């Protein structure tokens, strides 16, 4: 996830009472509020479950930010209505936004890393091994180097 703006060039420019859009689905809402805490815009309840953070967990909001939680996929189309928006990499990609224009990015949380999983009885199936082989192939590594553009976190063994 990253912070983007059509109005400001820095996260340091945040005005008092800024309007900020964040995703309204539970996992991405939590990710974005954690990112906004990381950049110093808010403070969150230290006892809150990091995977389930909501607006109710904000304990300090020194910039008096007005948050609007909305469908992630609609955020890019409404950027002009907000001072800043917080959006995930997949939404950035789908909207054709240049990921390098992010003013801030989240720290990757280990529990959010996506994985391909199969039932135990399928782990040695030819199709499952084909996925593993493709994922670890030089072609995939090269493709990700060329096409990642900062949108996705890539494990070190694939870089």
Where are these regions (language model features)?
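Alpha-to-beta junction loops
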Residues: 18, 41, 62-66, 80-87
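Periplasmic-binding protein-like
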Residues: 29-37, 135-156
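A ligand-binding cleft/hinge motif common to bilobed small-molecule-binding domains
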Residues: 75-99
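A conserved helix-loop-strand patch within extracytoplasmic ligand-binding domains
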Residues: 1-42, 141
């Amino acid at each position: 996830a990253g912070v983007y703006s059509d109005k400001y060039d820095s996260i340091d420019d945040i005005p008092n009472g800024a309007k900020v859009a964040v995703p309204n689905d539970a996992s991405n809402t939590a990710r974005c509020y954690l990112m906004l805490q990381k950049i110093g815009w808010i403070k969150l309840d230290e006892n809150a479950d990091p995977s389930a953070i909501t607006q109710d967990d904000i304990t300090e909001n020194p910039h008096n930010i007005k948050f609007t939680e909305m469908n992630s996929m609609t955020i890019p189309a409404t950027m002009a209505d907000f001072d800043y928006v917080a959006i995930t990499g997949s939404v950035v990609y789908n909207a054709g936004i240049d990921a390098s224009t992010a003013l801030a990015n989240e720290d990757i949380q280990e529990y959010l890393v996506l994985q391909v999983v199969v039932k135990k009885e399928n782990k040695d199936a030819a199709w499952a091994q084909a996925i593993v082989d493709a994922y670890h192939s030089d072609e995939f590594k090269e493709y990700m180097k060329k096409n990642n553009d900062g949108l996705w976190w890539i494990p070190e063994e694939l870089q």
